[in-house]
């Protein structure tokens, strides 16, 4: 499949406005009706994504409105307030901005313990709770979900996969009277599994479709090799927006900036599934890096085995999935190198975090790889999926052919083993050459389209 490059030159204000006018025209907006863009969920990437849109288009107030929803009532502890105060005072421009907005005093009071700050309150000033050290531009924050989304034209899903269905099911109540369906761009990198009436993977875009009834052509996925803080700091980055041609092409042009390159691609499923899989294997990558003292050799061996398992799993779900190359491979690489899931694996291996602490970590947010490990392994270990092994001639489940996934499940979910066991799995002398698993994948022997709700 060909990716279509969106032009990347630095864009003058006049051309930015022209791009805004173009997407308004595509969406059928009247001259006196602003384009309403709403972020749902305020994790690091969701907040950065909305902040970039606000910085790029927010100055055209009569033509566009950008806002973000997050739950209210999340109090910030004193240690975080102290750290936030240090960040503010270390940056003169930020300090001046808060003073101009008459917002500095509350941070002084919170530092002294004289008042409590809330996550939605500091987000208005540009501070994402999961990314305190990377201040964003000020944002319009709404804590009432109905107020946030009822008239939205473009919705950015920044929720974890574990919360997507629940929140969009609530949103569906506010869209019943709508004439025109909104366009939804999901940033969620995770999957869930269900087992009745038959085993299947459910991706975030499918959850949104189920919850809201919004046509699938109006639901897209955007992902790429991006670390949220680096993207906001204008490190050169790229992404793919995947879905129907009707929307991915105009939205690709609308979303691009001089430092943020957007390609469009039709293969939504592979990119979305890979978005979940890379988080799975990133946890193991963090463990391996720590346990081997950053051994390049060990990390490369792990990379070879985990990417072969990823290729195998995507070929279970799609007959001709996008190849693990280019941006897809780069996305996997950066997530294994520096994503929050890799960080989580490192902290577990160092003993600085424990599984008893759960998968929602202060200052980092939801570690989506944990639920994805459970979803993928339990789905692929169903006896109903067993097939004859092409070489050994005995029935095996797909999970049995994925030893890294299996060991991550036994470390993170059933807790049978400590983190050190990931090295035992990696160094197992009976482990096959990764090429063999890739050849099995390309044989389509295990292709089972119903795993994604498709007809055989």
From Swiss-Prot:
Its EC number is 1.1.1.8. It catalyses: sn-glycerol 3-phosphate + NAD(+) = dihydroxyacetone phosphate + NADH + H(+). One of its GO terms (biological process) is glycerol-3-phosphate catabolic process. The active site is at 278 (proton acceptor). The keyword Oxidoreductase applies. Signal peptide: none annotated. One of its GO terms (molecular function) is NAD binding. It is an enzyme of class 1 (oxidoreductase). Its main location: cytoplasm. Keywords: Cytoplasm, NAD, Oxidoreductase, Plant defense, Stress response. NAD(+) binds at residues 41-46, 189, 228, 340, 368. One of its GO terms (cellular component) is cytoplasm. The keyword NAD applies. Substrate binds at residues 189, 340-341. Disruption phenotype: Compromised in systemic acquired resistance (SAR) triggered by Pseudomonas syringae DC3000 avrRpt2 probably because of a reduced accumulation of glycerol-3-phosphate (G3P). It holds the Pfam family NAD_Gly3P_dh_C. It is found in: Cytoplasm. Belongs to the NAD-dependent glycerol-3-phosphate dehydrogenase family. Homodimer. Required for glycerol-3-phosphate (G3P) accumulation during systemic acquired resistance (SAR) establishment. This is Glycerol-3-phosphate dehydrogenase [NAD(+)] At3g07690, cytosolic. It comes from Arabidopsis thaliana (Mouse-ear cress).
């Amino acid at each position: 499949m060909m990716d279509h490059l969106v032009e990347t030159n630095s864009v003058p204000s006049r051309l930015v406005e022209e791009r805004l006018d173009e997407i308004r025209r595509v969406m059928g907006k009247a001259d006196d009706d602003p384009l309403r863009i709403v972020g749902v969920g305020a994790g690091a990437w969701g907040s950065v994504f909305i902040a970039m849109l606000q910085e790029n288009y927010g100055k055209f107030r009569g033509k566009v409105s950008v806002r973000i929803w997050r739950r209210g009532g999340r109090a910030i502890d004193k240690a975080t307030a102290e750290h936030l105060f240090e960040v503010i005072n270390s940056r003169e421009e930020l300090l001046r901005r808060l003073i101009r907005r008459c917002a500095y005093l509350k941070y002084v009071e919170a530092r002294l313990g004289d008042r409590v700050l809330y996550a939605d309150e500091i987000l208005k000033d540009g501070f994402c709770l999961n990314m305190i050290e990377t201040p964003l531009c000020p944002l319009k924050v709404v804590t009432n979900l109905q107020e946030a989304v009822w008239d939205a034209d473009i919705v950015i899903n920044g929720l974890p996969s574990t919360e997507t269905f629940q929140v969009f099911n609530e949103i569906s109540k506010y869209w019943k009277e709508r004439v025109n369906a909104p366009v939804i761009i999901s940033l969620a990198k995770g999957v869930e599994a269900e087992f009745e009436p038959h085993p299947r993977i459910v991706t975030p875009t499918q959850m949104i479709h189920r919850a809201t009834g919004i046509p699938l052509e109006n639901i897209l996925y955007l992902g790429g090799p991006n670390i949220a803080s680096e993207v906001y700091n204008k490190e050169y980055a790229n992404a793919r927006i995947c879905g129907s041609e009707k929307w991915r092409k105009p939205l690709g042009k609308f979303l691009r900036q001089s430092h943020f390159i957007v390609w469009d691609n039709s293969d939504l499923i592979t990119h979305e599934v890979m978005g979940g899989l890379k988080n799975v294997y990133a946890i193991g990558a963090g463990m391996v890096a720590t346990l081997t003292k950053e051994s390049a050799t060990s990390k490369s061996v792990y990379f070879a085995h985990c990417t072969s398992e990823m290729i195998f799993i995507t070929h279970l779900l799609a007959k001709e999935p996008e190849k693990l190359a280019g941006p897809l491979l780069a996305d996997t690489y950066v997530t294994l190198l520096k994503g929050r899931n890799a960080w989580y694996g490192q902290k577990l291996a160092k003993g600085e975090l424990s599984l008893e602490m759960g998968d929602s970590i202060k200052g980092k947010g939801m570690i989506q790889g944990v639920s994805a490990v459970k979803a993928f392994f339990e789905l692929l270990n169903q006896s109903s999926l067993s097939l004859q092994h092409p070489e050994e001639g005995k029935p095996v489940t797909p999970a049995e052919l994925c030893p890294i996934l299996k060991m991550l499940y036994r470390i993170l979910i059933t807790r049978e083993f400590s983190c050190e066991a990931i090295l035992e799995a990696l160094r197992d002398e009976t482990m096959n050459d990764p090429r063999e698993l890739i050849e099995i994948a390309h044989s389509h022997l295990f292709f089972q389209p119903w795993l994604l709700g498709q007809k055989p």
